[in-house]
Amino acid sequence: VLLRKLFIPLSLILVMLAACNNGPAPEEQIYEHLEEAVSLEEEFREQQEPIVELERKEQELYNKIINLSMDEFDQIKEYSQEAASLVEERQEKIDREKESIDAAKEEFDKIEPIIDDLDEEEQAEAKEEAQKLVETMNNRYDAYQQLYESYQSAIELDKELYELLQQEDLEEETLQNQIDKINDSYDKVIEANEEFNQYTEQYNKQKKTFYESTDLNVEYSEQENGASESESNEQEKEDNPDSEKDDTDQE
């Protein structure tokens, strides 16, 4: 089960800027891009529960399959086809998720040239915090790319598994080798996911620090979007560890 921490949206309730005649001040422009990036990750956020649900359904089918004997091959084949269909649905949602992350990163990147417009003396702290934010976001994005690639590899192995299960002459050793590959692959997914979560948590804290270093009056939402949703998913993972395929005892 993929567990992602999410951006925490912040609300700008009042801005008092002296440079309004020359357009929005740099810190206000940065704020707008940062919060637009949050909005662009909404699609990413919306994929989380459906992905978990698809994984749960697939695990149920897999459990049914391994409890059947080869005398019930027609049922095994039917369940395998259903599971393969669920894998395809997961693929679609993961791709949507990535598109959302990519769009948010593209929006975020717009702040880099604006950081140079922050005053070296009067806004030195804000400038330093903004630069830290860029570094963390880049690390977070790189971590997501690794997570996406790891998950893609795991999905391909899942597809291969359900193709194998539709072969009546499938040998137990071949099946077990495939299951081992899948479990190893999902271990990498979990590791990459933990790194992504760490960078997201770090980013959310640093964004708050950046806002506090400016003249922006920002209200911080009480809804702990990133932490609470991730913690909820962590519990779901414990209750439904889809990332691990059980060994088979089919005969």
Locate predicted features.
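Immediate post-signal-peptide N-terminus of mature secreted/exported proteins
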Residues: 22-98
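Sec-dependent signal peptide recognition
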Residues: 4-13
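General N-terminal leader/first-domain-start detector
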Residues: 2-5, 22-23
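Extended amphipathic alpha-helical interaction segments
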Residues: 97-183, 189, 201, 210-220
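Extracytoplasmic/luminal low-complexity segments enriched in Pro/Gly and acidic/polar residues
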Residues: 187-251
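Contiguous, function-dense segments enriched for cysteine-driven chemistry
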Residues: 26, 103, 198
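C-terminal motif of bacterial Sec signal peptides marking the signal peptidase cleavage site
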Residues: 15-19
